[in-house]
Amino acid sequence: MPTDGKLLDSSETHEVVHPASAPSRFSAVETILLAQGRRLFSWLSVGWAIGALLYFFPPYEPGWRLAALIFGIGAALLATTWSRLRFRALAFTLLTLSGGFLDAELSAHRLPPMPALPSRAVILHAHINRIDILPPRHGETPGRRLILQNAVFETGIDIGMPPLRRLLRVRLREDDTTPLQAGQEIRLRALFRQPSWPSLPGGRDPQREAWFANIAGNGYALGPATALSPPTRQSLEKLREHVAVTISQTLSGQRAAIAATLLAGESSGIDPRTRQDFAASGLAHLLAVAGLHLGLVMAFVIVFLRAALAAWPYAALRWPCREIAALGGFGIGIDYVLLTGAHLPAVRSLGMAALATLALMTGRHVLSMRSLALIGLAILIVAPASVLDISFQMSFAAVMALIAGYEALRERLLDLRGEGGFLRLLISHITALALTSLLAGAATLPVSVAHFGNLQPWFVLANLLAVPLAAIWVMPSGVCALLLMPFHLAAPFLILMGWGIGVIITLAHAVAMLPYAENPVPAMPGWGLTLYLLALCVLCLWKGPPRLFALAPMALALIAPWLAAKPIVLVSPDAGLMAVRDQNHLELGPFGSLEDETRDEWVKALALPISSLLAHPGCTETACPVEHNGRKILLRLRDRQDGRLLPSEEACRHAVLFVSASPAHGACPGAAVIDRFSVWRDGAYAVFATRQGLNLVSDRSTRGARLWVPKIGSHGMPNLPLAQEE
């Protein structure tokens, strides 16, 4: 039995100490900790994530002093009580929780403040940081969105000012065909706005996302872009374009579009119907290059190289074939990530692949909880806000479930493989692929439901078929095609890849047509998602039968969407859209295209079909009375008089709440009021019914005074000149 001093050592070979056999000198807590062995190391990243999450909870900007004090106490406790196991575990708990909190606070405060953006159309020049290809809208041609850095506005007050320290996102016009590449300096006329307020209290927070993404605002071009300098990075773009052109010369339609996505990161050719089918069937992840694709590419290359080296007697006897294959697979993986655009999920997966390659080179376990914890801890230290990111949550939930699942089923899988005959090998590999889809899909389904508000019950069936097809047919053919393109021999493998893609497209369409393929689910409250992820960590990381107790909080988290209170009235951040919820519908007032995103967020949050509020008896744009449990609410949906014409005394009689798209100007005395000035100050509103009356909840009251929440009346920090040197 190893000594307790090795509790948080990185070694995995650890004899489990059962409570019955633990020495009497250990307390009950120490006995439990000893039984976990070195698996406790994996909890360091969990503690860091919880600490980072604690920074985002308060409705105010928390100070750093208390967390720093706790960190100091943890460090002192670790230094003075290292020989006592329970105190050492407590010290690491304090260190990780406070460390994650301090890291998140430092990450938030080191970013530049939100700048004030011009309120009118402006000409600017900037450098292109990145170009995103956007899917077509309503059958139009694919769009382009530029991520601009070092932007300088050509306005009177901005002359001589330093460039913006944050990035700008701007969508180009559909008819702008100017060839642009990352690194170029451009001149452009555009209209910008700051990051949007949340569409409803407690909903998705675009302002927080923009703060940590270093984004200053979004805009759209009013004219064509003019290139002021040649591109500085051409080789990858040209190579990506060459791959896409070669694919289009061999394949056609959606097969060519998906092949270009998988091999060159060019997703603009995928039409809305295909995207909808893949989303409804739970296969949308196949259209976004990430860890799955990288893993399939590297696995194919490693298996091929190792088999080829083993078939050569000289190499098999003298060379480290496994290590050579691992390095070759990792090298191809790097090339693949760069070729497909180096998107953040793929880059994150490449870091995990680097650790897996290192494990192969040193004879360690390729996938272990320790390596997953190290990668997670590294990502959280660099970007603690990742704890709120869906890609981070889904990636680590999936990998953690895979490692735990394969650990639990290892003996049965070995029995299935037997002596290694061809048929048994084939069955074991297919079973492993199916098990991978099942474990990863089951672990990430609640996370997907929490973020997207959609339950796809047939996703398991679709992934059980599609992922093995992608692993043994589509991606190997694609890798062979890429390697043979310089020799003009890629066509046969592209055709083979196209056949496999065609099968997956047919499968996605068939599953999307099944009954109940898509089921809207109400928004999961934050505590529900947090509870689920913590319960999943306990289920996967804890050793022994007590981990099954995590199933109870996990079940509670899964029903959380139906336990949370639902608003009866919603008001958008600009009061341009209002909605009333009844039992079966979300009744919407009149709105324009600018409110489409808000409408979609409301529908996703409440999981109800929409209908027109104007169809309500006695409802007009200027006076729309509705009742809820005997309480009268008066809505003014539109007002061309800008509030100058007050509602009649009859309309206001017995009203307990007056909601107006224009200034209320003292209308309906005695009633609570939400008007245009209310949302200007506090953002979107949600009205909840309680036994005592109506509870008015604003976005500002929910988020509080945080760095990314604009102060009342604030338009951002003016772009001031730098101080002159002495």
What do the predicted segments below correspond to?
Residues 2-38, 94-285, 663-726:
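Membrane-interface helix/helix-cap signal primarily in integral membrane proteins
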Residues 73-74, 81-89, 93, 219, ...:
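Hydrophobic alpha-helical transmembrane segments in multi-pass membrane proteins
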Residues 64-73, 394-395, 463-469, 526:
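Alpha-helical transmembrane segments of polytopic membrane proteins
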Residues 22-88, 528-536:
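Membrane-targeting alpha-helical segments
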Residues 51, 126, 190, 262, ...:
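Divalent metal-coordination and catalytic microenvironments
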Residues 176-178, 182-185, 189, 209, ...:
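Non-globular, low-confidence helical/coil segments that flank catalytic cores
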Residues 2-58, 359-360, 479-498, 502-503:
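Hydrophobic alpha-helical segments
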Residues 163-164, 225-234, 276, 280, ...:
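Membrane-interface amphipathic/re-entrant loop segments adjacent to transmembrane helices
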